[in-house]
């Protein structure tokens, strides 16, 4: 079973295939449990999942491994990833586990791990756990009288709803707003509509009937067309699209236009900067964020800090440099005044707060900058390392020279899927399209020749 298990966001893959098998899930439970046993107290784990069919298999395998390591497991059921991060702290647990493949289709699944502070594990801790997966950890498991127990915990949805509501001022009501929320048939199908309704909004909820197979299927933050249509149909003020585990959000304005993570960060950063709440003199995002965001922040004398892709790296940079707004273009928004990880619902509430404070529609509030022409294409690969091939290296170097200082080029393997992502941006859209197509063509030819 030797191999790399962890990617940019935990362990992820096709359910019941390496590395997302019941056996490996059990061993991850054992290794994680042994890694976080400190002190003589009873050790606790909170374990949540989204709505995939394979969640039952992975959940039970994880419980077996964690209990074998002497950990008591609190089962949360289907619940958003940020709720797991919050409940790790609230329930004084040693570890948090979320079983989800986020925005991926139902046939994938994954395991995300959180430390006792509610933050995703560092690369170093993941490497330590990974190193144990291929070893005989059974030698260090709990004695028969020290095994863990598993129990279902009631009221966790209400805890998270109250947490989300508290991120808005108590005096603020969403009364007068008609909101369409697309829950992607995922983990937030109960909590998101309820939280918005309790805050006073008129709520139209769609994709709230998970069946194990329809999570993210033509819905949610990666497929917002249905939400756009519904916003038009009911004449809503705003549409909110979450993904399968509700750690990312995409907004649709009253005209049906999409507002991505870059524009959401710009909106929140400007509002917090004006109120004196923005910390650290800037915002943290990744290499994928649009150059327009960087220029917009620069006009306010704010800095855009860039990290490699993955909200975990955004959070690590935020913590290291004292910033409280960060995120990704894809819609992972991290507001560290409230959360330790991306939280789609909480981020949407901050957008709604901007609407209520300023009394202006989303279409006006979200047009903070004109995006620089940007094109992203994915090339599916069967294996190997095409980026190390000489023709691909030459094509990339040529593209950088053609773009010069007027643009950016980002080429990277996906950390969650067998893809090479090719992104370019610059003020000349024809040049951007040309360099992306040239690189994609060379990678495809290299892949075919392999």
Swiss-Prot record:
Q: Tell me which cofactor or cofactors this protein depends on.
A: Mg(2+)
Modification comment = Activated by phosphorylation.
EC top class, in one word? isomerase
Q: Does the keyword Ubl conjugation apply?
A: no
Keywords attached to this Swiss-Prot or TrEMBL record, sorted alphabetically, are:
Isomerase, Magnesium, Metal-binding, Phosphoprotein
Residues in the active site? Answer: 102
Query: What residues bear Phosphoserine in this entry?
Result: 102
State how the cofactor is bound: Binds 1 Mg(2+) ion per subunit.
Record: residues binding Mg(2+): 102, 243, 245, 247
Which GO BP annotation is one of this protein's?
Answer: peptidoglycan biosynthetic process
Question: What's a single GO CC term here?
Answer: cytosol
Which EC number applies? 5.4.2.10
The organism's place on the tree of life at top rank = Bacteria
Question: Any keyword Nucleotide-binding?
Answer: no
In terms of Gene3D superfamilies, this protein maps to: Alpha-D-Glucose-1,6-Bisphosphate, subunit A, domain 3 (3.40.120.10), Alpha-D-phosphohexomutase, C-terminal domain (3.30.310.50)
Q: Which catalysed reactions does the entry list for this protein?
A: alpha-D-glucosamine 1-phosphate = D-glucosamine 6-phosphate
Question: Can you name one GO molecular function term for this protein?
Answer: phosphoglucosamine mutase activity
What the record says about family reads: Belongs to the phosphohexose mutase family.
Q: HAMAP family under this entry?
A: GlmM_B
Q: What is this protein called?
A: Phosphoglucosamine mutase
Query: What species does this protein belong to?
Result: Mesorhizobium japonicum (strain LMG 29417 / CECT 9101 / MAFF 303099)
């Amino acid at each position: 079973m030797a191999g790399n298990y962890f990617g940019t966001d935990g362990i992820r893959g096709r359910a019941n295939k390496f590395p997302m098998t019941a056996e490996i899930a059990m061993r991850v439970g054992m290794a994680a449990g042994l890694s976080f046993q400190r002190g003589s107290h009873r050790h606790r784990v909170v374990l949540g999942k989204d709505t995939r069919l394979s969640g039952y298999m992975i959940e039970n395998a994880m419980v077996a491994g964690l209990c074998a390591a002497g950990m008591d497991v609190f089962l949360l059921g289907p619940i958003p990833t940020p709720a797991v991060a919050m409940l790790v702290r609230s329930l004084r647990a040693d570890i948090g586990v979320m079983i989800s493949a986020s925005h991926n289709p139902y046939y994938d699944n994954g395991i995300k791990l959180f430390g006792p502070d509610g933050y995703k594990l560092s690369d170093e801790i993941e490497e330590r756990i990974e190193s144990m997966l291929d070893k005989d950890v059974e030698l260090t498991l709990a004695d028969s009288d020290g095994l863990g127990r598993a129990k279902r915990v009631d009221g966790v949805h209400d805890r998270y709803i109250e947490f989300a509501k508290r991120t808005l001022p108590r005096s603020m009501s969403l009364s007068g707003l008609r909101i369409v929320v697309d829950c992607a048939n995922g983990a937030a199908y109960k909590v998101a509509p309820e939280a918005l309704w309790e805050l006073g909004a008129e709520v139209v909820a769609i994709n709230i009937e998970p069946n194990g197979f329809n999570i993210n299927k033509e819905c949610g933050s990666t497929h917002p067309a249905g939400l756009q249509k519904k916003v038009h149909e009911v004449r809503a003020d705003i549409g909110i699209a979450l993904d399968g585990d509700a750690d990312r959000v995409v907004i649709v304005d009253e005209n049906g236009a999409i507002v991505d993570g870059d524009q959401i960060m710009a909106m929140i950063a400007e509002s917090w900067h004006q109120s004196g709440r923005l910390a650290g003199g800037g915002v943290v995002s990744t290499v994928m964020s649009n150059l327009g965001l960087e220029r917009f922040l620069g006009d306010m004398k704010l800095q855009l800090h860039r990290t490699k892709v993955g909200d975990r790296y955004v959070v690590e940079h935020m913590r290291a440099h004292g910033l409280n707004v960060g995120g990704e273009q894809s819609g992972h928004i991290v507001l560290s005044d409230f959360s330790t990880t991306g939280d789609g619902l909480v981020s949407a509430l901050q957008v709604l707060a901007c609407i209520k404070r300023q009394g202006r529609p989303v279409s006006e509030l979200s047009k903070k900058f004109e995006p620089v022409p940007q094109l992203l294409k994915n090339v599916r690969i069967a294996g190997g390392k095409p980026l190390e091939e000489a023709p691909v290296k030459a094509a990339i170097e040529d593209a950088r020279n053609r773009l010069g200082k007027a643009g950016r080029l980002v080429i990277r393997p996906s950390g969650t899927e067998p893809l090479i992502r090719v992104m370019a941006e610059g003020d000349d859209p024809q040049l951007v399209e040309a360099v992306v197509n040239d690189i994609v063509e060379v990678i495809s030819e290299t892949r075919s020749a392999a």
